[in-house]
């Protein structure tokens, strides 16, 4: 089960191309200037099963998937289960936004989720580093990480670091 605040279909702001973005409840980072402070409460939204979420994802054949929130890493076990199902039944790519740094994701559930992701946008939003020209992130401390390459190489490998708008 995942506690979900909202699902946006065919959005284009949470990664490249059209995406189905799943916004979860719960975040302890509480970054000043957060664009989604209503997501901080862990009891917000409603619980949804992997099957319910997978149906929504499959029913949008052209959209890839983004996990956001809140912070999906607080519900890593549920998102890992969903990501495994997405991998099994689709060829969609999976992005995830988190306020945690990649290097701090050491809980077994978080590592299991990481193994299913294509890209992780990591780090807290820092208002003094806000930059509207950054693609797919709000502040310059946040990184867009190629997760499979990073796990393979044992260090952070950035995803297409030359990208800007």
Task: Indicate residue ranges for each PLM-predicted region.
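N-terminal [4Fe-4S]-dependent radical SAM core
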Residues: 1-23, 32, 36-42, 156-157, ...
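Conserved Radical SAM active-site core
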Residues: 2-5, 18, 36-96, 100-113
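Conserved C-terminal portion of the radical SAM core fold
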Residues: 61-68, 93, 121-127, 151-165
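P-loop/Walker A phosphate-binding loop and immediately adjacent motor/lid segment at beta-alpha junctions
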Residues: 75-84, 90, 130-165
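Short Gly/Pro-enriched loop/turn and capping motifs at secondary-structure junctions
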Residues: 101-103, 125-128
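Short, hinge-like loop/turn segments at secondary-structure boundaries
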Residues: 112-115, 138-140
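Receiver (REC) domain switch/active-site residues of two-component response regulators
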Residues: 118
